[in-house]
Amino acid sequence: MVTIWIDPPAWPAHGRLWSHLISDESIAELHDFAAGLGIPRRGFEGDHYDIPAEYYERALASGAVETTGRDLLRRLQASGLRLPKRRGDKGIERVTGWTLADGTRADIDLILSPREMTDERIFAAMVFVQDVGGRHLLTWSERRQEWGAPGGWREGDESPVANAVREAEEESGLVLDPAELRPVGYERFRRDPHTPAPGLWVPGRDILQVYAANLSAHRPPVRVEERGQPGPEWVEDVELGERCRDSFWWPLAARVLALEQPPQPE
């Protein structure tokens, strides 16, 4: 039986005290336990849940085991489930064993952050684009056979922002002002060493930088990248979810684009 651990509510934020809830064996079991308490998935921080103080006794009554904050951190680190991140960043999800278009497999950490990662680690960039009415720009990737936000690999010595701007123009014809792009998160890739071929991986370059851009125009004109392929489209929230919900990056997109409801206090 999987043990769920919790520390006493001692962490102040947003005018409340909070506990941390972890599993040292299974993230899936942790999600199930939190859902049983009525804690929204939005409370998940990539390797633990932040639990408001008013849920603490309920968690204990449901089978969580109390421990100190220090012991809880030790158990999380020893479990291999810890999602490392910089101070101020927010872990969203670890996607494990994802097969990429080049045939390689990777574990992918999705992290929310208002700061760019170190330039030399960034191998690619993407940008979530919204028009003034809140519609989302989607482009079709023939290589990946899926809809998504404009993005791709860096070329030459271009900056990550220039990378995102170029990809948006190539894939949709939309010319973005680099000043409109703001960093909102990143995807950290760890390639499965048992994958037969390294694909396009370069050691030390493991980050896809994610930006967002909010435009002041309604549905700016876009054009198809290549004849015979589906053209880019402006879509509403529901359509975005229907087309992209199965993509590995969806949990990060949902958080960046505020497509999830925030937790409601009792």
PLM-predicted stretches and their roles:
Residues 46-84:
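Short, compact, well-ordered microdomains
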Residues 17-47, 54-58, 62:
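Basic nucleic-acid-binding interfaces
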Residues 244-266:
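Charged phosphate-binding loop/patch that engages nucleotide di/tri-phosphates or the phosphate backbone
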Residues 154-248:
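Unchanged
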Residues 130-170:
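Conserved Nudix-box catalytic region and its N-terminal flanking loop in Nudix hydrolases
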Residues 33-37, 58-61, 67, 91-101:
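Alpha-helical and coiled-coil interaction segments, frequently adjacent to or embedded
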Residues 2:
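Phosphate/adenylate-binding glycine loop and adjacent helical scaffold
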Residues 73, 80-126:
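Acidic, metal-coordinating catalytic segment for phosphate/diphosphate chemistry
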